[in-house]
Structure formats: structure tokens, C-alpha cells
């Protein structure tokens, strides 16, 4: 089975458990911590995947690194470790976040703009586009891209809304070339 499929299964199991316990947000916060720990300390992944380090020692590292987290999250990380699937932890957290956002009516969106967006601009974009994708709100991350010249490009899931000047110029350019032939 592919890693993304396995990550989805683990995320779904965690999400169902969190739903039963009414701990969706708390679980997401704790999984975010796990993801951040692995992102900030890539050496941890190296240690946990090293073939010469015993599984008992690896479990000890995990227990120490995540001692402050709930037993459920600790157990999940240990389970991934025991089943040699620790590499999917980031994908699992991403899948859990997606499931939690679906329940809340939230979607992640990436907005590309020439300059950083203000909080008001992000809020306005969220209000304008959330209903177009059937959501209540959008979690917006902003990436500055000077090549756009002006305007914005918005990515929500696999949908792209391109209102950039560079895109409009490209469309005009293609139109002129088509009429030339």
C-alpha cells in the first residue's frame, strides 16, 4: 500500500477517535507539535530510521521527545515507529488537518501576490472565495511572487484562480499570436 494511503488510514483512525472524545482541536494541536518537532530536528528522523539503533532505544527517544503530549498521540507515533512507517508522520498530520478542516467548513488556500497581504486583505479574499468552494472560511497562506507583476493568484485544493497581471498579459499575447496565423 502506498505511503499516502497508509497516512490517510492512520489520520482517519485518529480523527474518528478524536471525534468520539470531542478532542478534534486538541488532537490537531498536538499533531502539529509532532510535525514541528520532526521539521525542526531532521536528525530525529535519521535516528528513528537508523537500522543499527534498537527499537527499544528508538521508543525511548519518542517517549522523551513527546512526553508532554497525550497518550493517544504518543501511542500513534510509537505505532508508526514499530511498523516502520515513521516517515509518514508529516503526511498523516496533513491528512488529519484536512479531515478536521472539512468538518469545520474550512479549506487551506495559498495566495500568491507581489507583496505580503495584510490581515484585512486575507480576510477579504477568504470571504470572497470561501463560498465559491463551498466552505465557511479559508486558511490563507501568502507567498510573495514578484513575477505576477500585480494582482493575485489563488490556489484552493486543485483549483487555481488566476487574477494576476502576468496571466492576463500571457492571455493577450496568445490571442495576438492566434490572430496572426
UniProtKB/Swiss-Prot annotation:
Bilayer topology reads: Peripheral membrane protein
Q: Which SUPFAM superfamilies match?
A: N-terminal domain of the delta subunit of the F1F0-ATP synthase
Q: Which InterPro entries match?
A: ATP_synth_OSCP/delta_N_sf, ATPase_OSCP/d_CS, ATPase_OSCP/dsu
Can you cite an annotated GO cellular component?
proton-transporting ATP synthase complex
Entries under NCBIfam families matching the protein: ATP_synt_delta, PRK05758.2-4
Q: Which family does it belong to?
A: Belongs to the ATPase delta chain family.
Q: What does this protein do?
A: F(1)F(0) ATP synthase produces ATP from ADP in the presence of a proton or sodium gradient. F-type ATPases consist of two structural domains, F(1) containing the extramembraneous catalytic core and F(0) containing the membrane proton channel, linked together by a central stalk and a peripheral stalk. During catalysis, ATP synthesis in the catalytic domain of F(1) is coupled via a rotary mechanism of the central stalk subunits to proton translocation.
Give the protein's recorded name. ATP synthase subunit delta
Organism, as annotated: Priestia megaterium (strain ATCC 12872 / QMB1551)
**Recorded name of the encoding gene:** atpH
Amino acid at each position: 500500500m502506498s505511503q499516502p494511503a497508509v497516512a490517510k488510514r492512520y489520520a482517519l483512525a485518529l480523527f474518528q477517535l478524536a471525534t468520539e472524545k470531542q478532542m478534534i482541536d486538541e488532537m490537531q494541536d498536538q499533531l502539529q507539535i509532532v510535525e514541528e518537532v520532526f521539521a525542526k530536528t531532521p536528525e530525529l528522523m535519521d535516528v528513528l530510521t537508523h537500522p543499527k539503533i534498537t527499537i527499544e532505544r528508538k521508543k525511548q527517544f519518542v517517549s522523551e521527545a513527546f512526553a508532554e503530549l497525550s497518550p493517544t498521540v504518543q501511542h500513534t507515533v510509537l505505532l508508526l515507529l514499530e511498523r516502520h512507517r515513521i516517515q509518514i508522520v508529516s503526511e498523516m498530520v496533513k491528512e488529519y488537518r484536512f479531515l478536521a478542516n472539512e468538518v469545520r467548513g474550512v479549506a487551506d488556500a495559498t495566495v500568491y501576490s507581489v507583496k505580503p497581504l495584510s490581515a484585512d486583505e486575507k480576510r477579504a479574499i477568504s470571504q470572497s472565495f470561501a463560498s465559491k468552494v463551498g466552505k465557511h472560511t479559508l486558511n490563507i497562506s501568502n507567498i510573495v511572487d514578484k513575477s505576477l507583476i500585480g494582482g493575485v493568484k489563488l490556489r484552493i485544493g486543485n483549483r487555481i484562480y488566476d487574477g494576476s497581471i502576468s496571466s492576463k498579459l500571457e492571455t493577450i499575447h496568445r490571442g495576438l499570436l492566434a490572430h496572426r496565423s
